[in-house]
Every structure is written in C-alpha cells, then in structure tokens.
C-alpha cells in the first residue's frame, strides 16, 4: 500500500479543477497492490485519518466531497449539466474499494477524501497517520511529520 497526501492548492486545482484544501478536504492518493496468493476483500476496509492532536478526520464519499466543495466555494446556482460533468470527472479519480484485489485485478489506484475536523481549510497538517482496519492485517502509515 502506498499513500501520498496532496497538500498543495496548485496540485489540487490542476487535478480536480477545484481547490480542495481551501474547502477543508485532503485528497489522499492511494495505490493498493495484490501481493499474496489469496484474493483480498477490501470493501469492508475502514480508513481512519488522525492528526498529531488525536483529532479524527472524516472520510467523505465522493458525493459528500463534491457538496463540500460547492458549499465552501459558495456555489449554489449552477448549470445542472456542468455539475453532472464535474461529478463524472471527480468520481473518475476515486479508488475502487468494491472489487477485491486478486491475480486478475492486481492494482487499485485513486483517491480517498478526508475532511478536516472543523471543516476548516487544510493548512500544513502535522502528524497525520492513516490507519486501515478490517484487512487481513491492519496497516498504519505516517503521512506527515509531527
């Protein structure tokens, strides 16, 4: 498992055409790789993100992340076709957690989206630790320094 947070506004803007950190959303780029001989069911996996203060960041569904982006940018009136197009493009980046990792499907790549504890903009978070539970073995990864 490899994980990298997108911490800069520029990266977020370029990739998603939206400033996710300003909306209080931290996108985590993930890669899950199949390395065992037995298929690994990942749809029951639980992803938890905590900062150095012990506060838990909320995992957002793509739909919730989109609503948060729209709300944070005060977008209340929009062309329905434009929103559908944005949703389609945004969800194309989401990691597939529904299909198991197996010999025929060895890699899953994409993003998970976490909201800051107070819905405030993401500003150089310290001591971020990602914990993945309900896998054959739990995984803990330090993402940022304390």
Predicted region positions:
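Conserved functional micro-motifs across diverse proteins
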Residues: 1-146
